[in-house]
UniProtKB/Swiss-Prot annotation:
Mg(2+) 1 binds at residues 165, 167, 303. The keyword Phosphoprotein applies. The gene is WRNexo. Residues 1-120 are annotated as: Disordered. This is 3'-5' exonuclease. Its EC number is 3.1.11.-. One of its GO terms (cellular component) is nucleus. The keyword Methyltransferase does not apply. It is an enzyme of class 3 (hydrolase).
Length: 356
């Protein structure tokens, strides 16, 4: 029977594994076929199959691939012809040899530096004068009376400038508090600080000092201070004080022909060439609490001291400007004066000749 059995070929699945064909026949023949399909024989068959596939010819055939042909690509000569045609239709624009303003300035002055100019460091104001500090009603009245007597003794002066400023507490919840401090300065060697926290009404001597006919009150945003003082102390009338006061920022714009709104700190930088320490810790401190500490007293004194310094400087500049304008008109006439004035001349410096 064995010689009539046909051995079926093995099948391979997609993974390359060989599956033996179904065994047919009697039990004896099936046992013989199982013995032939032992693991050793299977391993030999797989090794033979791998060796056949790894022959040099088969490897070269698998690796070698036909090179793809170039399609629809122009030859170098055709590309050059296309470029020449485009250049003929749209020739390249020639760069103008004329120098622009920016290139001319760079050529004359050199390439501008990318670094910004560092701001000038100014020295801080150091006040070494006296600070007279009063909190009681009678003390404030006596001090104001002493200042009035000193003003009356200045017989050679028609106007006595007096720096004026105020301080009050501020809260982001409740807003500005009641006027707490008034500081004045008529002489750079002494500043007066009056704390109003205990007062329900301003002393008559202090009101008389503010309304003295020879006193010219000055400060920055001083009109708003007078209006607030009137709201907090109705015995003070703001209108007469506003009429005779001088706002240093407005006066600076008139003399120096500048523009914009000024703060006391900026005026100190521009006019006096000094820096002010406007620390928020002191500026927003409790000005209504008695007594004031040293930092608060120095802050209040410096405000009116530097105000008096700025006033003196602007006063001197105004005199020089008026004198220069008069001399120029006398030498060159009104027409030349108007022409030069239209060009932005401030006449803060002396000008003797002009060419138009």
């Amino acid at each position: 029977m064995d010689k009539y059995l046909i051995k079926m070929p093995t099948k391979t699945n997609l993974n390359g594994d060989q599956k033996p064909a179904a065994l047919k026949g009697t039990p004896k023949t099936i046992d013989k076929q199982k013995e032939k399909n032992t693991p050793t024989e299977k391993q030999k068959q797989e090794d033979d199959y791998v060796e056949k596939e790894n022959t040099p010819k088969l490897r070269n055939a698998q690796i070698a691939k036909p090179a793809s042909k170039r399609k629809n690509q122009d030859t170098p000569t055709e590309v050059k012809d296309i470029k020449n045609e485009e250049d003929g239709e749209n020739p390249p624009k020639r760069r103008s040899a004329r120098l622009t303003r920016s290139t001319r300035s760079m050529a004359e002055e050199g390439t501008p530096s990318p670094e910004k100019e560092k701001p000038e460091k100014l020295p801080f104001i150091k006040y070494k004068g006296a600070i007279k500090y009063y909190t009681e009603n009678h003390e404030i009245a006596a001090s104001a009376d002493d200042v009035i007597q000193w003003i009356d003794k200045q017989t050679t002066l028609d106007v006595v400038p007096m720096a004026f400023d105020m301080e009050w507490p501020f809260s982001f919840q409740t807003g500005p508090g009641k006027s707490s401090v008034i500081q004045v300065c008529v002489d750079e060697r002494c500043c007066y600080v009056y704390q109003l926290s205990k007062l329900k009404k301003l002393p008559a001597a202090l009101v008389a000092l503010l309304n003295h006919p020879k006193v010219r009150l000055h400060g920055v945003n001083i009109k708003a201070d007078f209006r607030k003082l009137q709201r907090d102390f109705p015995e003070v009338s703001a209108d007469p004080l506003i009429e005779k006061c001088v706002d240093l920022g407005v006066w600076c714009n008139e003399i120096c022909e500048t523009g914009g709104r000024w703060s006391l700190e900026r005026l100190a930088n521009f006019i006096a060439k000094k820096a002010m320490d406007k620390s928020k810790k002191v500026r927003m401190s409790k000005w209504h609490v008695i007594p004031l500490d040293e930092n608060q007293l120095m802050y209040a004194a410096i405000d009116v001291y530097i105000g008096q310094v700025i006033y003196r400087d602007l006063e001197q500049r105004e005199k020089v400007k008026l004198q220069n304008e008069a001399n120029f008109k006398e030498q060159n006439g009104d027409a030349a004066f108007k022409a030069v004035k239209a060009l932005g001349e401030t006449f803060l410096d002396k000008i003797t000749q002009v060419t138009i």
